[in-house]
Amino acid sequence: MSHTASTPTPEEYSAQQPSTQGTRVEFRGITKVFSNNKSAKTTALDNVTLTVEPGEVIGIIGYSGAGKSTLVRLINGLDSPTSGSLLLNGTDIVGMPESKLRKLRSNIGMIFQQFNLFQSRTAAGNVEYPLEVAKMDKAARKARVQEMLEFVGLGDKGKNYPEQLSGGQKQRVGIARALATNPTLLLADEATSALDPETTHEVLELLRKVNRELGITIVVITHEMEVVRSIADKVAVMESGKVVEYGSVYEVFSNPQTQVAQKFVATALRNTPDQVESEDLLSHEGRLFTIDLTETSGFFAATARAAEQGAFVNIVHGGVTTLQRQSFGKMTVRLTGNTAAIEEFYQTLTKTTTIKEITR
């Protein structure tokens, strides 16, 4: 069977792998306002400015109503901002004609929370669907489908229907389908929310493989900080339509600046006592301090000095985490004994790190 110039052969598709560069995404002063029939207005996005570099994995995190999903709809052209610019590889897509948007969407893969598979199609049939829409030659389609199923670890599941697959396998089919047309941008909207922890870990491992081997830019929308911790290079924290905090995963996890970021980080790290634990700790003798641990915090030297002066240091909570090849942690300690030595311990560490006393 012959192939037209617009229909890549399996060899041509293989030659395109892996992608050498993902899509660059830029939000410039993006605002989105929704109006209902009674003229009431809701600001879903409020002057969002954010850049996602090619090949980067960014986690966009926030509670329900923060504006995360609205961002996704803008990226794939399903909605338009009220004001601002949205650039994909330097091209502003705001106001772009639908014919051009359709072409743009072919370069964007999408995976969903509820998988969105066709129940009447096999796993292979689901992966093949976007290739049919793209009018790819049948032989090339079949080869590409098998290639993608093998890539996601389902090479022997092509003939299975969705009802015969586990949740994790369904999401793998969804990922294979999203990758079928060789996109350079992948949008993952709460892609692991419906999965158990072990399956979530497996799917995140697969997404890391996608980014590592194919060079695809990945935008992960989630309300789970553990997902961001596992996969992202950068994180943007959203609240009430605004990006309230942005930085590397290490920066945000080790030193969250906003209250909402602090709450999210606490759910993933659990290295500070919660209110109930604090109340229990406060029921015992001594002063309680939570201390940020870094290479320059001076914690161990201060502990040794306190012990020499008759203060006893007892570690009651905490942990150390390594992210992006850097370590950080928090330690909660109870000090008893010489009151002057305890105060010196506290004052010394205020000069070298962040130390907070836990009180009622």
Curated annotation (Swiss-Prot):
In terms of PROSITE patterns, this protein maps to:
ABC_TRANSPORTER_1, ABC_TRANSPORTER_2, METN
Q: Which reaction does it catalyse?
A: L-methionine(out) + ATP + H2O = L-methionine(in) + ADP + phosphate + H(+); D-methionine(out) + ATP + H2O = D-methionine(in) + ADP + phosphate + H(+)
EC number in record: 7.4.2.11
Major localization class: membrane
**Xref: CDD domains:** ABC_MetN_methionine_transporter
Instruction: Fetch the PANTHER family from UniProt.
Output: AMINO ACID IMPORT ATP-BINDING PROTEIN (PTHR43166), METHIONINE IMPORT ATP-BINDING PROTEIN METN (PTHR43166:SF30)
Q: What is this protein called?
A: Methionine import ATP-binding protein MetN
